[in-house]
A protein has these predicted regions:
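N-terminal organellar transit peptides
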Residues: 1-82, 89-225
Length: 225
């Protein structure tokens, strides 16, 4: 699910990242939503996504980075793979209690001859350099570049507290994350508590708590008055 609210200046990335024709969240949808937002007001991007297309994620990151207003990120349950990269655009990055983040090296499915496959590998290397720089900007002073690259190679999962400790998030939000179940085999090291067995090709279903989080956001705005 992708949605946005111009009244609260919130954007909800509650699905996989990828082509809109496949029912996923694409960069065009995000850019269209940003144009409707107050240009001088802070925007909150609420994430509950297992990731997806790195191409779309880079385009979404760039669109958010170009937005003239301040961009903050709230991880409502999970930000894995490409979604964790998008999260790095936030001036602040909060994560709900029980929420998780995952970072890993980008991968893809490709077909072609040896020359074409080498070109694909080169593109993946470029993407890895780009996302490594984004993570490193947050984790600098805590981990060396080689350690960060190893986190990516190992497919590293972080609890909410671990994400803050690592520098990937700025604070833990005092709400309980809704659990999300990830299809078995989607990632190499998915924590067992998140694994659900699904038929081949079946997509992960994300809990859609839009109204709940919108109410929380409105309450937070009221409390600041």
């Amino acid at each position: 699910m992708f949605d946005f609210d111009t009244n609260t200046s919130e954007m909800f990335l509650y699905d996989d990242i990828g082509p809109a024709w496949m029912g996923m969240i694409d960069a065009s949808s995000v850019m269209a939503a940003l144009k409707k937002m107050p240009q001088d007001a802070p925007v909150t991007v609420r994430i509950n996504s297992g990731g997806g297309s790195v191409d779309e994620a880079v385009a979404i990151f760039n669109a958010l980075e170009r937005h003239p207003g301040e961009v903050n990120v709230a991880i409502d349950s999970i930000a894995a793979s490409a979604a964790s990269y998008i999260a790095m655009v936030g001036k602040t990055i909060t994560i709900a209690k029980g929420g998780v983040m995952m970072i890993h090296s980008p991968w893809t499915i490709a077909m072609g001859n040896a020359t074409e496959m080498r070109k694909t590998a080169d593109v993946l290397d470029l993407y890895e350099q780009r996302i490594t720089e984004a993570y490193a900007a947050r984790m600098q002073g805590k981990y060396s570049p080689d350690e960060i690259k190893q986190f990516l190679a190992d497919e590293t999962w972080f609890s909410a507290d671990e994400a803050v400790e690592a520098g990937l998030a700025t604070s833990v939000e005092n709400i309980i994350a809704e659990p999300v179940m990830i299809a078995e085999g989607r990632y190499a090291k998915t924590p067992k508590m998140f694994i659900v067995r699904k038929d081949a090709g079946e997509r992960t279903a994300y809990p859609h708590a839009r109204n709940r989080y919108r109410a929380i956001a409105n309450r937070a705005k009221f409390d600041k008055r």
